[in-house]
Amino acid sequence: MYSKIALTIGGSDSGGGAGIQADLRTFMALKVHGCSVITCITAQNSIDVTCVEPVEKNTLLIQLDTLFADFGIDALKTGMLLNERIIIDTASKLNTYKITKIIDPVMVTRTGSKLLEDSAINAYKKLLLPIADLVTPNIYEANLLSGLEIRSKEDIENSARKIIGLGAKAVLIKGGGLKDMKGKDFFLDLNGRKEWLFNNFINTKNTHGSGCTLSAAICGYKALGFELLDSIQKAKLFVEKSLDNSYKIGSGPGPLGHH
């Protein structure tokens, strides 16, 4: 039943809504066995993040080595890579793995606040984009990666071209950060194939972990053997249904219901 294996590399969300926890729930919903490598531990709830602690270098590398020594992992995704050191160490390992790599560049919050220092963003560009089979930035992250201010559909397409120029094989820019772009994402690959992808917009405030869920679902579908664009389309539908089943557990935005 769970013959395929997907790996998530990212941060632990103590509130259970995003990060590793959302990724593993997504993998389980897709009937894919989920493995995890923790890069940082957070203390958070629905309204605040009160602490973020990176794991030690050896702890990170041993987690990766131990998993790959025994499991035939079919696809992996990255989430929160907290600093330049973690990005460098992760990229050095990922460069040796000949499997699908989905890079979710968690750099900016949904409201536009930067999570990473410039040195870490530069490490993303130099080390992770060239080995990415797909990068899944939101509008703000695409801005940082491409250096282009994004205000329109045309800006999104130009930003995608810049990101492809940095070495990524494909990019999916999530348009939800722009007015009138809810549920609209832009896909571009190295061969010039481009698609605007549309889904129904689910009007809910319970969206915590939606970006993590999307990249995890893409990773899960790739592990199951689907082509990349098919995986993206299926993942978008999965997120739509999960948002429709979202629920409230605290004072702030609640998590998705992964079904």
Regions found by a protein language model. Give the residues of each.
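Short glycine-enriched, charge-decorated loop/helix-capping segments at active-site entrances
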Residues: 48-54, 113-118, 147-151, 203
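Charged C-terminal helix
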Residues: 54, 70, 229-259
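Conserved N-terminal subdomain of the carbohydrate kinase-like
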Residues: 2-8, 20-110
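Phosphate-handling active-site elements
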Residues: 30-35, 194-195, 221-235
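Short, small-residue alpha-helix embedded
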Residues: 21, 26, 143-144, 204-228
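Conserved phosphate/ATP/ADP-binding segment of small-molecule kinases
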Residues: 118-194
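Glycine- and other small-residue-rich loops at beta-strand/loop junctions that grip anionic moieties
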Residues: 12, 78-79, 113, 207
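Short pre-catalytic strand/loop immediately N-terminal to key active-site residues, enriched for Gly-Thr
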Residues: 5, 9-15, 194-208
